[in-house]
């Protein structure tokens, strides 16, 4: 990716300087007169440092040059075999026709057979900007470029660097309605790329080179703000804080994406975007890239430099204000699994001020009779804002490996992850299947996980919901829980779970709203409560501080709700069968257990008696049971009281109120 960024940047500058150099030569025609034109062209060549084997100007104002060499920055050069140009003159519009352009920059070579610029705005204002006579910023110079249409038959870029050989070709490129540097519309008939990565000489064994072939069909787009893009690369955000985002790319589509490797093939039917908006970064992109490039070229980085290098590069994301990408018709095939098919109907990604959204529709993976499917999935409100804020604070603090507190500060805002209609069906011995050792047949109707309101990177509000998890228990006899369910008479289960808790900062409490479980032909269990003494130490990221804070926790309240829908009857029968008694005898035996237990903790206590009566009634006729235990003190019951209760259970009863009922 870094090589691609550098290539695009260098190619962009090459095109700009190429057009500028050609325009300087062509604009000389406005002076008038054949002799005067030739003299002006030669003078312009000398001032720009360009050289030409021949210069001819006809009486119609056309400028003809051959074998032109244009010097560029960093000892790079552009060679043009021939140029025919005409400046704006009377009723004639400007025109440039250049042939056989070649650009060399170290390991990179760019060749363009022809460039035709129609309705080119080649006038004195543009000439001053392009030649450097005017005191303008790079962005202001780009804003002087106007043309009706630019046609480029093809652009071939080849480069070899650090064991990577790459050739990329764009075909039938055209840009239209270029006004003050803004491109109204652009398109290309296609793009192909061949990349070969040499094996790492440090790797063990006989490593093979990696070859990647890429092709893209028709590409169409609108609205490129080239002047503002130039500002992003050459200017830092203003010190006064005014840094409004601007759209730099409008809608764009690309069709028929194909990527092939030795192991398989990935295809997209279409990629599209509604556009991207950006803002100026803390420093110009060019400055950051050059500084990162200098550091990465150093063979021996100082301890921590490599980490800081990656963190600084990560900060570039802050320049992206808003954008999106949609991909449809995704397919994957692999030679390792020739019978496997992988398809996704649609993927979408959104980016809005460091908040990302992701969605997927129609995932379908199959191998023989085995399959994995997901109707839809989404991830919303995933925020990188706290991550970038943490990185800035860490870099400001100076070198040094981050401790746990810093690492916690780097955590992004998780947001909400959701799945719908997830299903896996895999079985051992399936023909052309996934070669699993145990059967796995599971389906989930809905699942969501939300981790919100982070404090120092740690979420303070947690929500998890899973509806209708269906699991076939066949083939899982080695799992104790599954084996017990089968003994209870279940061949498959359909269960749902729910977790909801949040931190009450003002009252230093952890509120457990609900931890629930339910199942078809089973019933449901719901637990809620309040844990006191839950302060900011638990969000510090400091392990020692968090461990010490555990001893300050208190129990304030707990509530239990149980509703039977068949599980208790199955459990009672299993208990009776194991102990050689009838179901009635088993129920009678179990109903006596609460009274026996109460004798050791406080027989005669009103709360205990209510609990005994409710549990006994539930055992006799299992339907609904509700139990609530609340600390008498607003501060709750601390660790010392719980430790004392292990020796004297009755001591705990004096500190709580107990209510219980059975329906």
Regions found by a protein language model. Name each.
Residues 2-48:
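N-terminal type II signal-anchor transmembrane helix
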Residues 29, 33-663:
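Glycine-rich, small/hydroxylated-residue low-complexity segments
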